[in-house]
Amino acid sequence: GIKNGLPLNDPDAHFDKEHPWRDLDPRFYADITYDGLQVIQNTAKFTSEQKDKQIQYANLYTGGNYRDVKNESRTGYLLHKFTPLVVNGFDEGFRDYGDALTIQVSWMRLSDIYLMYAEAVANGYGGPSAKADGCSLTAVDAVNKIRERAGVDDVASKYAGSLDGFMSELRRERAVELAYEGHRFNDLRRWLLLTEYPYTIKTSQEFDRVELDKEDPTQSRVSNFREEVIVTRNFSEKHYWLPLKVSDVNIYPELYQNPGW
């Protein structure tokens, strides 16, 4: 999304396809390595070929040397969340973490609690402006708490005024705030959207680099910015369930396997 709190596809967001990394939600920059970002600081060990290819920058444009689908990026982006930029073979920042980079992830974050509260209240207490008994926050307030911390504008009134509009923003908020923390599959199952378009596809960002701003890559200019489908997931109704162990099902004739399995 955009820093102003709107999704990219909202006309009022004014998403600029020539400068697609400008004025985005600050969490994008914290979570994602995008084209032109300097990911290697120490270039002293570079070979002549590495210097020529300028591999210290994430060359994620279409055809760039960070777009090898076998071991780099299929999507035009790389993961930055949980991974300090200096953790690479040239900067050797991983040495500060011992023999290997260890990631500590909480079982439950406060942001997740706010989002669960917002979803439950909006659906169970009459809408986005409702509060749960004994609580001071509305569903919208709870989401805005998270956005305030992240430096993003509040949920726009056109989304906060209806349950459908609010849920579209809440689903997006969970995707952004809890990105790469293992929630999305079960979120989509809970919302019964696992088998629905566009949640069944994965896309790549394809573009040509026109001008790289090495000082501030958010200002870099591109052309032919577009999305292409690279994966279509063949989920079906059975994936709203999980299979029971065959050994458990075989214990009692009355214990049936879950539908579709």
Language model region names:
Residues N123-G127, V155:
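Short, flexible helix-adjacent loops and helix caps
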Residues L110, Y117-E119, G124:
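Structural register within alpha-helical repeat arrays
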Residues Y34-I40, V152, V176, L194:
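Short loop/turn segments at secondary-structure transitions that flank enzyme active sites
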Residues G127-G134:
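Intrinsically disordered, low-complexity Ser/Thr- and acidic-rich flexible linkers and loops
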Residues G1, Y97-W107, V143, R147, ...:
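Long, intrinsically disordered, low-complexity segments
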Residues P7-L110:
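Flexible, polar/acidic helix-loop-strand segments at domain edges
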